[in-house]
Structures are given as structure tokens and as C-alpha cells.
Design a protein with these regions (language model features):
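Short, solvent-exposed beta-strand-terminating loops
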Residues: 41-57, 283, 287-293, 407-418
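Aromatic/acidic polysaccharide-binding cleft in carbohydrate-active enzymes
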Residues: 248-348, 352-367
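Noncatalytic carbohydrate-binding groove/subsite architecture in carbohydrate-active enzymes
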Residues: 110-113, 146-272, 276
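Conserved, mostly hydrophobic/aromatic
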Residues: 19, 40, 113, 127, ...
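Carbohydrate-binding surface patches
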Residues: 361-401, 407-410, 445-448
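N-terminal catalytic cores of secreted or lumenal carbohydrate-active enzymes
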Residues: 1-193
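Catalytic metal-binding/acid-base residues of hydrolase active sites
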Residues: 133-134, 178, 200, 247, ...
Length: 454
């Protein structure tokens, strides 16, 4: 593989290193903020997915008898997570329901939240109006629910002007779903500073390790391109794109979510987001989603050792509700996908730029991404072959030597230690000064971060 420093792409932002937190999980527990820091997380989204359209922040309650953890107030979220973890915040305001739970969301309630956040440390940079309000699964008590015109008008005439009046410098966004039925109306009629898109690679029961690792991340890029096309058609080609939810399966997560396979998918997703110039992303979900074999896909065709799965990227402190038979694992323990974030945090630094990375030869299972790294170069290289190591030549155009090369690796062998409930982290090897190109051996099913100094 060859990196071309002259082929400069998008600016890199650490805001792609984001995760969701949910208001049903007690975020005041010791270890939550520390886990986010350990994984290199720089951005979070609150208060949840569909819960956002039933949640009322002033009373910390939800319509439709939704459960909210009493400790997980907005104030506690700021105090116990945001400040100690030093993360930037995106909030989804309630479009679906008013405080009386008998009509659509109230822009005044959203504006008061913006004002509260401004006076409370100004930690929230992004505000999205509603969650997946284009879908019938979402609470929407407007007279015409799940309707693009109703949504666009509500944003343009109510939410956007009132929220911007509360804080003119904040960013207010709308939800998008590529296609003429939603985006053409919303993007042409609403007011917005950014758009928010959600992506899940697979349907429950149809999970495939091969698809997830070999094709799913590239499918995300195709969808981002579709959003860009919709924005361009609306005359807003430069509008930032925020991928607010990411995952491998859109419901009933099984053992794939706790496996090395999802970690390798997540690492590629971060590479694709970086290459695409996405301004921000938050994976679903940091804590609060353990599930056992009674609900998700635990097929023997999927690789993994656990009798639990779930959206959580860190242990909730299992066993717990939803996976009562799981082997005990301390709260905050990094699961495989969190390790992918940890590795990528060595690459996704503000002020850097994407660089061209070309893979050639008989290495069909190898993927690579590259970015500047100070005066050096950072590569993220994947071996997607399950049983075979790959010897690859790594070169940088115009550079014949390096004063120091460091390689960080998370792979199948490290994950396999979890069969004994040992959740090992990445290894780091300092190779010292090297002539370029140099040959690296990539272990089976591995994500590798290679830092090449000048």
C-alpha cells in the first residue's frame, strides 16, 4: 500500500469519535465518564433515540409511560459525564409530543432547553429537531404525523427561530432520509444549520459477518453520498452532515454486536466517515443495552464467544436486566467496538487532513485509510481475512525513511481471550527508525494503526 501526501482530502475532525447515551441508563455511576475517555470519545448525543420524542427535560419524564432513570437528569448528565469526560454534546429535542402529551412538540420547550444549556456551561453545540420522525415507529402527535411538510413548517416557523433566539451561535439541525418522499421537501422548506442521518447496516436475523466486514461500511458511504446529492439538489451542498446513529443491526442485537466482527466494521466506518468529510458521528449506544439469546441473533454462523449481545459498547456492569446469565463484567469495561474507537483516536485529530491511500496486489482482504499526523503520517490498516496473516509493504510517496514507526493492533486473537472473560486491549509495538517502504505482517482479523514519523 502507498500513501500519497500530495493527495489531500477532507479535513479531519475528532467529532467523528462519538457515542450515544440514553436517559434510561444511570449515567451518574462511577466509571461512565472514565470509560468514554479510555475509548477516546470526543462527542456524545443525548437523551436517546425514539425516547427523544417523548422526553420532557424540565420534569425528566416521558409521555406514553416511558422509563427515565431518576438520576439521569440533564444537569447530572452535564455534571457527571460531559464535564469530566470533556466531550461535546448534541441534543435531540422533542418534536413528537408536548408536555401535556396531547399534541406535537412545543418549540418553546426546546428553546428553554437551549437557553438552559447556554447558561449552564454552553456544552451543547448541536440541537436536532426530533429523532427519526419520518418513521411510523416514532411518537408524533401532530395532526398529520410523520409528514415532511408538517415537519418542515414546524421547524421553519417555530423550532428554528425560537431556538436560535435563545442562542444565536448554536447549531440547529433537521433529520434526513435520502429520497424524494422526505428530503426534497424538508431540505427545500425547513431552516437548518446541519442535517442528521442514521445508518444501521443490517436487519435483525439477517446478520452476516462477511457482509458486515466486507461491504457494510462502503454501503454507509453510498448513503452519505445520497444525502450529499439531496443537499445539492436543495441548493445546500455545503451543509454539514452529522451521522447521529450508527450500528450493525437496527433492532434485536445479538452476539455480533459484542464480537471482533463489529469492531472491524466500526473501524472501517470511522475511516469512511473521515474520508467523506462527515462533521460528526455518534454510535448507538455507549451504555444501556444488554440482551441475551432470547431476543437477538446468536446463530453459530456468527463469530463470537458471548452468551450476550446488545448495543452497549461498554459493559453496563453485567449481569443485569436483559442478560441475567452473563458472566460478571465490571461497569465500563471496553468491549471490542470501543477498542476500535480507542485505536482510531490516535488518528482522528483536529487540524489533520485525509491523505490518499492505495492498496494494490493480491490483498483482497486488506483495507487502508490515511491521514496526516503532525509532520508525519497515520494509517489505519485492516486485515479482513479470518485465518490468514497478510504481509504488506507500506510506503509513503517521496519518503525513503522514517525516524520512528509505531504499530497498534487489535485483532481476533486478543478478542478470543474474552472466551475466558479477559477483555484485552490493543498491543503497541515501537519499531524505531525504518527504511521505507517497510513490510508489516497483519494478523488475521485485525485493525492496525501505523504512525510513521518523518
Amino acid at each position: 500500500m502507498t500513501v500519497n501526501p500530495a493527495q489531500v482530502g477532507s479535513a479531519v475532525t475528532d467529532q467523528i469519535l462519538g457515542m450515544n447515551l440514553a436517559n434510561w441508563f444511570d449515567i451518574t455511576q462511577t466509571g461512565v465518564a472514565g470509560a468514554l475517555q479510555a475509548a477516546g470519545v470526543k462527542a456524545v448525543r443525548w437523551p436517546g433515540g425514539s425516547a427523544s420524542d417523548t422526553f420532557h427535560w424540565q420534569t425528566n419524564t416521558e409521555c406514553e409511560s416511558g422509563y427515565v432513570n431518576a438520576n439521569s437528569t440533564f444537569q447530572n448528565f452535564l455534571t457527571d459525564v460531559v464535564v469530566p469526560a470533556a466531550v461535546d454534546v448534541a441534543v435531540t429535542v422533542n418534536y413528537g409530543s408536548n408536555a401535556a402529551c396531547n399534541a406535537g412538540g412545543d418549540p418553546a420547550e426546546a428553546a428553554l432547553w437551549v437557553a438552559n444549556a447556554l447558561s449552564n456551561g454552553n456544552k451543547v453545540s448541536h440541537w436536532t429537531v426530533g429523532n427519526e420522525v419520518y418513521g411510523s415507529w416514532e411518537t408524533d402527535l401532530h395532526t398529520v404525523p410523520h409528514d415532511a411538510t408538517t415537519y418542515a413548517n414546524a421547524v421553519a416557523s417555530g423550532f428554528y427561530p425560537q431556538m436560535k433566539a435563545a442562542n444565536p451561535n448554536t447549531l440547529v439541525g433537521v433529520v434526513v432520509e435520502p429520497g424524494a418522499n422526505w428530503d426534497s421537501i424538508v431540505l427545500g422548506s425547513a431552516s437548518y444549520d446541519f442535517v442528521e442521518y442514521h445508518f444501521y447496516a443490517q436487519a435483525p436475523g439477517q446478520e452476516s459477518d462477511t457482509y458486515l466486514m466486507q461491504q457494510a461500511a462502503q454501503a454507509l458511504t453510498a448513503q452519505i453520498d445520497a444525502v450529499k446529492a439531496d443537499l445539492a439538489a436543495a441548493g445546500h451542498a455545503s451543509t454539514p452532515i452529522y451521522v447521529g446513529e450508527l450500528g450493525s443491526v437496527y433492532s434485536n442485537p445479538g452476539k455480533q454486536t459484542s464480537s471482533i466482527t463489529q469492531a472491524l466494521y466500526a473501524g472501517q466506518v470511522l475511516g469512511e466517515l473521515m474520508n467523506a468529510g462527515v462533521s460528526r458521528s455518534t454510535w448507538w449506544l455507549a451504555f444501556g443495552g444488554c440482551a441475551d439469546s432470547s431476543s437477538g441473533n446468536f446463530s453459530s454462523s456468527l463469530y463470537g464467544w458471548q452468551n450476550f449481545g446488545g448495543y452497549m459498547l461498554f459493559s453496563d456492569g453485567i449481569p443485569e436486566y436483559g442478560c441475567s446469565n452473563a458472566t460478571p463484567l465490571a461497569l465500563g469495561t471496553l468491549l471490542p467496538t470501543a477498542r476500535a474507537f480507542q485505536l482510531f483516536s490516535s488518528v482522528a485529530h483536529n487540524g489533520e487532513h485525509v491523505l490518499g491511500a492505495t492498496v494494490s496486489g493480491n490483498t483482497t482482504g486488506v483495507r487502508a485509510y490515511a491521514a496526516s499526523s503532525g509532520t508525519g503520517t497515520a494509517l489505519v490498516v485492516f486485515n479482513l481475512n479470518e485465518t490468514t496473516s497478510e504481509a504488506v509493504s507500506v510506503g509513503i510517496s517521496g519518503q525513503s525513511s522514517s525516524s520512528g514507526v509505531t504499530v497498534q493492533t487489535y485483532d481476533k486473537a486478543l478478542y478470543d481471550q474474552s472466551q475466558s472473560n479477559v477483555w484485552a486491549g490493543p498491543t503497541t509495538v515501537a519499531l524505531g527508525a525504518q527504511k521505507l517502504p517497510l513490510t508489516l505482517t497483519l494478523t488475521p482479523w485485525s485493525m492496525n494503526v501505523v504512525i510513521v514519523s518523518p
